[in-house]
């Protein structure tokens, strides 16, 4: 009887440590460990587990497809669908392979904006602010998450002014026309130029899209490593000893940082 009670206590303690370890790791590790937990756990509460998520979090937006690990930064479907459609226009699906949405790039961006990338307050973000050179990179006084929120809002503003509808409801050519206006600096950001420029938003959007397509699946993009497969990129191989010793061409299946296929 005593042995049984001891076993129950041991199991309870182990379960407690597992639970608190995951929770504490999510807090200490920030968005990285939060992403790991959200990516690997397949529980019913996965999508509702982030603070502040609204009831529409679990619904299927146009940008989610069948892949939905849960969102951290984007709290409603409309905003997420808008940025998803913009990313799809930058990296569209074609006969060569899937596009940004199917590859999970919008979820990659969601995770990045919820972490230090989006909250880049330590990157010399205090004034005075001067006009930067093109070679100096990102110069806005807004942190990246703020610039993305503003940019998404202005996508809809431009869409309604030009086509009397929200951006996510437009056809591909209309979306391209609006994105081109941002790329060329013609769109109105609704704020002074020294606060944010449309081309700044477009550059970040384009970079985030490409990164989401080709990043390690650990970061929620490059779903099933399809981005790597299109490039025949081997990913993170432990060694190439066997391949070095052979005279024939060897096809190597890509490997992620952790585990097998994601």
Q: What are these model-predicted stretches?
A:
Residues 1-11, 15:
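N-terminal secretory signal peptides
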Residues 2-4, 66-71, 78-85, 89, ...:
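Mature-region segments of soluble proteins
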Residues 13-14, 18, 206:
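Basic side chains
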Residues 40-55:
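Ser/Thr/Pro/Gly-rich low-complexity linker/stalk segments immediately outside membranes or between
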Residues 54-69:
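N-terminal low-complexity, Pro/Thr/Ser-rich intrinsically disordered segments
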């Amino acid at each position: 009887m005593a042995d049984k009670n001891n076993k129950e206590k041991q199991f309870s303690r182990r379960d407690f440590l597992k639970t608190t370890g995951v929770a504490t790791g999510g807090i200490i590790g920030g968005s990285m460990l939060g992403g790991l937990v959200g990516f690997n756990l397949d529980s019913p509460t996965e999508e509702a587990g982030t603070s502040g998520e609204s009831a529409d979090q679990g619904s299927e937006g146009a940008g989610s497809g069948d892949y939905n690990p849960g969102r951290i930064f984007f709290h409603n479907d409309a905003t997420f669908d808008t940025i998803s459609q913009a990313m799809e226009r930058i990296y569209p699906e074609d006969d060569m392979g899937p596009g940004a949405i199917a590859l999970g790039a919008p979820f990659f961006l969601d995770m990045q904006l919820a972490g230090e990338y989006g909250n880049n307050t330590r990157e010399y973000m205090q004034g005075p602010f001067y006009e930067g050179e093109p070679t100096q990179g990102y110069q806005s006084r807004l942190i990246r998450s703020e610039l993305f929120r503003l940019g998404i809002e202005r996508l809809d503003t431009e869409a309604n002014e030009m086509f009397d509808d929200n951006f996510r409801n437009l056809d591909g050519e209309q979306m391209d026309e609006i994105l081109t206006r941002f790329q060329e600096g013609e769109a109105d950001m609704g704020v002074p130029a020294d606060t944010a420029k449309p081309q700044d938003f477009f550059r970040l959007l384009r970079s985030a899209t490409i990164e989401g397509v080709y990043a390690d699946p650990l970061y929620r993009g490059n779903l099933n490593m399809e981005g790597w497969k299109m490039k025949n990129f081997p990913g993170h191989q432990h060694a190439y000893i066997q391949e070095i010793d052979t005279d024939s061409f060897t096809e190597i299946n890509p490997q992620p940082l952790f585990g097998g296929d994601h």
